[in-house]
Curated annotation (Swiss-Prot):
Main location as per UniProt: cytoplasm
Organism encoding this protein: Leptospira biflexa serovar Patoc (strain Patoc 1 / ATCC 23582 / Paris)
Protein name stated in the entry: 3-phosphoshikimate 1-carboxyvinyltransferase
Entry binding sites for 3-phosphoshikimate: K20, S21, R25, S167, Q169, D317, K344
Gene symbol of the encoding locus: aroA
Similarity comment: Belongs to the EPSP synthase family.
Active site: D317
């Protein structure tokens, strides 16, 4: 296994930016609510800012209250305007899919949703098909089940759906469509996916009836009023420094403060602890319906572990950085049941395998994942990021830990989710 070439600096306490998933959803729930809301801890990365700007063009009044803080006034969902131009979501898959659901349920809304070249390659049929079954008019402009999407808002009908995959984006798109159209929705999935949307509904006074952990119903009335949102740090962003803190040399812990610990998102902690990582959760609390805490991460000897299928939905965004942990693990690393990785910002299975091979790692790629045996050395290489922020950050962590010189074709994608990443990496 690889050996770390650095130890922590004296400064062993960091904060990471606000949760990306919650930041997107906060904008959408501000739009659905009547009146003034305040948002604190908003991720000022390109993805959530694109979503915020899109809804600003439809009638939200947005003013800055300082770094990561905004005042947002909504005329109410029934008074949102059709945008005059195309809604550009940049690289934000969450933004475009969830917004498509919400807008599809607003009668009289007319909008075209698009994004950058990477986003326009990502599959949209997974939300288009069930939305159309609800009575929505959502079509792919190019006829290829990809963005741009043209939406004509309709009054939708009550709907029951069994999702073929565990996807918080599909679930949230359909639930937001139901909230917009004041209808009931019954939803069932195969595994528990992240539930920030459900938490936000409850936080705003809505009722969700759970039939099981993967099966629920949401019914009107939905009367949401403006409120104050406080967004915790993103555990998907913290994951890069959790792995860094586990794999670094020495014995001093790294303290990562104010992290969202939603049970549907902490699979990363479970996997790393199963690999032998020592991670302590302190200062636990609940805010705006979300569990929060601070993480103490200790340098640890890691080993290969079996990552079970039920954990995949809760670690899908963290698999690239878990792979880096695998390079520092006894016995190597394996991931399977992760076909969904092929539909992310890049085909993350191919992206990770391609870059690992550039490092000289012998990797076996299969349709739903990849594996490699214990690694002793890696070589200098140029990393291709495939326009994917998590690929860029994962290999930047590897370069810092290993001391191996890695160059990158483009690291600007990091700003979509983690502005300030390289400054924090330099500071530790």
């Amino acid at each position: 296994m690889l050996q770390p070439q650095i130890k922590l600096n004296a400064k062993n306490e960091i904060y990471v930016p606000g949760d990306k998933s919650i930041s997107h959803r906060t904008v959408l729930f501000c739009a659905l609510s009547q009146g003034k809301s305040e948002i604190h801890g908003f991720l000022e990365g390109e993805d959530p800012l694109h979503t915020l700007r899109c809804f600003e063009s439809m009638g939200l009044s947005v003013s800055s209250l300082g770094k990561g803080s905004y005042s947002v006034v909504s005329p109410g969902k029934q008074n949102l305007n059709s945008p005059k131009g195309v809604l550009d979501f940049g690289n934000a898959g969450t933004g475009i899919r969830l917004s498509a659901g919400l807008l599809a349920g607003l009668p009289g809304m007319n909008a075209t949703l698009t994004g950058d070249a990477s986003l326009c390659k990502r599959p949209m049929a997974r939300i288009m098909n069930p939305l159309q079954e609800m009575g929505a008019s959502v079509i792919s402009v190019e006829g290829n089940d990809r963005a741009p999407l043209r939406i004509e808002g309709k009054q939708l009908k009550d709907y029951s759906y069994v999702s073929p995959i565990a996807s918080a984006q599909i679930k949230s798109a359909l639930v937001l469509a139901a909230l917009a159209s004041d209808i009931s929705i019954e939803y069932k999935e195969s595994e528990v996916s992240r539930d920030h949307t459900e938490n936000m509904i409850r936080f705003l006074g809505g009722t969700i009836t759970h039939h099981s952990s993967v099966h629920f119903t949401v019914k009107p009335p939905y009367h949401f009023e403006g409120t104050k949102y406080v967004i915790p740090g993103d555990i998907s962003s913290a994951a890069f420094f959790i792995v860094f803190g586990l794999c670094v040399g020495g014995s001093e812990p790294l303290l990562i403060k104010n992290i969202g610990l939603n049970p549907s998102r902490i699979g990363i902690l479970t996997v790393l602890q199963n690999m032998g990582g020592k991670i302590e959760i302190i200062a636990k609390r609940v805010e705006c319906g979300e569990e929060i805490g601070d993480l103490l991460v200790y340098p640890s000897k890691l080993k290969r572990t079996v990552i079970t299928e039920d954990l995949i939905p809760s670690i899908i965004d963290e698999i690239p950085i878990l792979t880096i942990a695998g390079l520092f693990s006894e016995g190597g690393f394996q991931i399977s049941h992760a076909e969904e990785l092929r539909a992310k910002e890049s085909d993350r299975i191919r992206s990770m395998v391609s870059n690992l091979e550039r490092l000289g790692v012998k990797v076996k790629e299969v349709n739903d994942g990849y594996e490699f045996d214990e690694v002793g050395t890696i070589q200098n290489a140029k990393i291709e990021t495939f326009m994917d922020h998590r690929i860029a950050m994962s290999f930047a962590i590897l370069s810092k830990l290993s001391g191996v010189s890695l160059s990158f074709d483009d690291t600007s994608w990091v700003d979509t989710s983690f502005p300030g990443f390289f400054e924090i990496l330099k500071s530790v």
